């Protein structure tokens, strides 16, 4: 029947589109891998850069926890002086919604060229990506994936101009390889706010590097 023929045609068109997208992603990923290999970069250096980022996030988390405790102590002392009782601020429950529900964690609309956990080959050696790499257009807006507070906005070797958001309950998001940073440390942001402009990298492929971390550990942003 005509309806069956139309359905089959639509299925073929969708399959063709998906095949084309997959092929484009493979080509971009291959180009990115070639650039990594062509730069004076070794897997060891990349891993050292990742360790530096991990140490930075852990340090930021400790500072935020200490600041929260100090604020609680000040509030308790002030309440005691005034003769009033105050409730101790509770630690927010783990934000499972940060990963499992709501809009996908895409800070930019560009195509994904490398996913969390995928193999990464540099100079003949292989390990796995700790974050997600998006293809971008230079200077396009990079958006906060959830509400949070800026706890780092500066250059970091291996990640270029980097911005890190604290979302509470041990969750942090990391946005690297930016052309410019639009927010400063201490700024509070809402989901969807432009926090930076993408596209600063050494090679011909402009990419944004994105990570989700929980209690310092990189995790899959797709859940």
Language-model features and meaning:
Residues 4, 98-99, 196-197:
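A generic local structural motif
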Residues 96-99, 141:
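Long low-complexity, Ser/Thr/Pro- and charged-rich intrinsically disordered regions
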């Amino acid at each position: 029947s005509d309806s069956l023929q139309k359905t089959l045609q639509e299925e073929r068109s969708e399959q063709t589109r998906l095949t084309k997208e997959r092929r484009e992603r493979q080509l971009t990923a291959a180009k990115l891998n070639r650039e990594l290999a062509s730069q004076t970069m070794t897997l060891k250096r990349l891993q050292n850069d990742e360790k530096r980022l991990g140490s930075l996030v852990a340090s930021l988390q400790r500072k935020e926890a200490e600041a929260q405790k100090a604020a609680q102590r000040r509030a308790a002392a002030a309440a005691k002086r005034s003769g009033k009782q105050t409730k101790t601020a509770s630690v927010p429950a783990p934000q499972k919604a940060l990963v499992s529900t709501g809009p996908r964690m895409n800070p930019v609309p560009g195509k994904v060229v490398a996913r969390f956990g995928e193999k990464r080959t540099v100079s003949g050696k292989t390990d796995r990506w700790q974050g997600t790499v998006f293809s971008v257009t230079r200077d396009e807006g990079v958006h906060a994936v959830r509400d949070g507070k800026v706890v780092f906005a500066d250059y970091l070797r291996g990640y270029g101009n980097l911005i890190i958001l604290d979302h509470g309950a041990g969750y942090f998001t990391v946005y690297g390889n930016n052309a410019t940073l639009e927010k400063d440390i201490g700024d509070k942001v809402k989901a969807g706010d432009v926090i930076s402009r993408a596209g600063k990298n050494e090679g011909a492929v402009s990419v944004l590097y994105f990570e989700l971390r929980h209690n310092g550990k990189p995790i899959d942003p797709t859940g």
